[in-house]
């Protein structure tokens, strides 16, 4: 899995630093970003899927969504568009440079993110997430 891949890549980098042989470092760094982001995004996704979760946001998050997207419906429509366009993930992130929330479609775990952004919500739209229950109807999964 992603955790084992991340740990293995980190071990390779540590060994390379110790030996001074960096021939496999580029591949290991790629494995750090791929496996690290895969692990972090799946962790966030499962935290978001809490059985007691769901419904519309409240409090500070709702206030910020309304400020940055105009309304909850505006955010939701844009998030669903990101999920429909993405090959892998749709993310709601906080962009500290622009100081606002953004919806981001991401095709691979480590591509498409804004540097320095903090993911708040993740929707896994890889086929393994929905195909068993929804078949090719990804839109139905997104709507659920």
Curated annotation (Swiss-Prot):
Q: Does the keyword Metal-binding apply?
A: yes
The cofactors it requires, by name, are: Mn(2+)
Signal peptide boundaries: none
Q: Spell out the Gene3D superfamilies in the cross-references.
A: Fe,Mn superoxide dismutase (SOD) domain, Iron/manganese superoxide dismutase, C-terminal domain
Q: Which InterPro entries match?
A: Fe/Mn_Superoxide_Dismutase, Mn/Fe_SOD, Mn/Fe_SOD_BS, Mn/Fe_SOD_C, Mn/Fe_SOD_N, Mn/Fe_SOD_N_sf, SOD_C_sf
Record bears the keyword Manganese: yes
Query: Reaction catalysed?
Result: 2 superoxide + 2 H(+) = H2O2 + O2
Annotated stretches, region: Disordered: 1-22
GO molecular function terms here?
A: metal ion binding; superoxide dismutase activity
What does the entry list as the binding residues for Mn(2+)?
42, 124, 128
Q: Which UniProt keywords apply?
A: Manganese, Metal-binding, Oxidoreductase
Give the record's cofactor note, including how many are bound.
Answer: Binds 1 Mn(2+) ion per subunit.
The EC number of this protein is 1.15.1.1
Of which family is this protein a member?
A: Belongs to the iron/manganese superoxide dismutase family.
Q: What does this protein do?
A: Destroys superoxide anion radicals which are normally produced within the cells and which are toxic to biological systems.
Q: Which named protein is this?
A: Superoxide dismutase [Mn]
